[in-house]
Amino acid sequence: MRVLHVSPHPDDELVGAPATLMALRDAGHHVVNLALSLGRPADHDRRRAEVTEACRRARFELMITEPPIAMSAADDRSDAEERARWQIGMAMDGADPPDLVIGPSPHDVHHAHELAGRAIRDVLATRDDPPPWWMWAIWGDLPFPTLVTTFDDARGHEISEALSAHVGEMARADHRVHVDARGRLTAITAAEKVFGFGAPALAADHAEVVTEVVRHDGAWMLGAPRVLDPASPLARPTARPVGAWLDSPSPRDLGGGPYD
């Protein structure tokens, strides 16, 4: 199976859902990380080198949008979103199209994550039979996660080692701490958030979650709740429609945000 991961920024490939990507990789699936941007122009060379090394360590194929999309707070977000749609569409329509798309939720608070999430949504909605979409959240929350990936300390160390390649970003904000802390917290909360309150706890020290949505007969349906089976990761979706949530305005549009 070919997995397309969409990164608004370099380092998102190792912060959004890294344990899930690595579990899929280890099961023999081919993971491609599409980096939409390289941050501010002055940082392009550094961040290109960092994401190249990070993907080498993680054993992900890397594709970088050329030229990188400008999606910082002061940039033209409409243009950025249009370019993101075009780039994702090109990846979808290539000689080897993906069987699964993974990327940010359109409600992930950070403007660049949200525009990338909307771009994924819009591109998939134009396809007759698009692949499933697994959404992660870094700055926001997933109100109804559907899929849990559990992992151990060894996997956590592997994620940290790959994320350490993003030297400049880790010096600014150490997301290795973020990923570790989130994994420990999610191991406690995931079972009840995915399977219902009162569900037994996971037998794991670390976990991460994504929300799966599947486009069927012109409607978005929520994925089936489950623990990831990397060898057979896809499943028939539920009959629960989630298009109203996917298409709803971001809370940023209602109350603003720290970058507005």
Report residues per predicted region.
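Active-site beta-strand->loop->alpha-helix modules in alpha/beta enzyme cores, enriched
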Residues: M1-P132, L222-R226, A231-D260
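The feature marks non-catalytic terminal segments
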Residues: A54-A58, D129-D260
